């Protein structure tokens, strides 16, 4: 690799790409971004709709979530504790998110290109609203969404 390319790659490794709002430069990485996904024969308006619905075993309630008008409403419905959560939710939630992300980035070529173009930068869901999927706003959160996107980016680069 030429020296200049090595320097550019080194700079990119130190680069952090923050995303959260769908209006951000990388807002399409948000689960609220309006990129429909088809999973298990059903079309979901956003990956957020799909993710939130998978918390529940009640098929009727899952369908209600799928049909709501916005990812914000889907997220609110996903926090509804009057409906029982799947007992194994904590152990499967990352697997569900992986499935949603893979569908989103495989089914939309322009998103796949955008994700691949971020390598090797660190992707961070920068929000104080979530310290599990995001960075907690102060960098101390787990940033699991960012890490799952980087994992997917690596897989897609290999499959290219």
UniProtKB/Swiss-Prot annotation:
Q: Which UniProt keywords apply?
A: Glycosidase, Hydrolase
Q: Name one GO molecular function term.
A: hydrolase activity, acting on glycosyl bonds
Q: Which reaction does it catalyse?
A: 2,5-diamino-6-hydroxy-4-(5-phosphoribosylamino)-pyrimidine + H2O = 2,5,6-triamino-4-hydroxypyrimidine + D-ribose 5-phosphate; 5-amino-6-(5-phospho-D-ribosylamino)uracil + H2O = 5,6-diaminouracil + D-ribose 5-phosphate
Query: Where does this protein have coiled-coil stretches?
Result: none
Q: EC number(s)?
A: 3.2.2.-
| Keyword flag Hydrolase | yes
* Keyword presence, Membrane: no
The superkingdom of the source organism is Bacteria
Q: Which NCBIfam families does the UniProt record give?
A: ribofla_fusion (TIGR02464)
Q: What does this protein do?
A: Catalyzes the hydrolysis of the N-glycosidic bond in the first two intermediates of riboflavin biosynthesis, which are highly reactive metabolites, yielding relatively innocuous products. Thus, can divert a surplus of harmful intermediates into relatively harmless products and pre-empt the damage these intermediates would otherwise do. Helps maintain flavin levels. May act on other substrates in vivo. Has no activity against GTP, nucleoside monophosphates or ADP-ribose. Is Required for swarming motility.
The record's family statement is: Belongs to the YbiA family.
Q: What is this protein called?
A: N-glycosidase YbiA
**What organism does the record attribute this protein to?**
Shigella sonnei (strain Ss046)
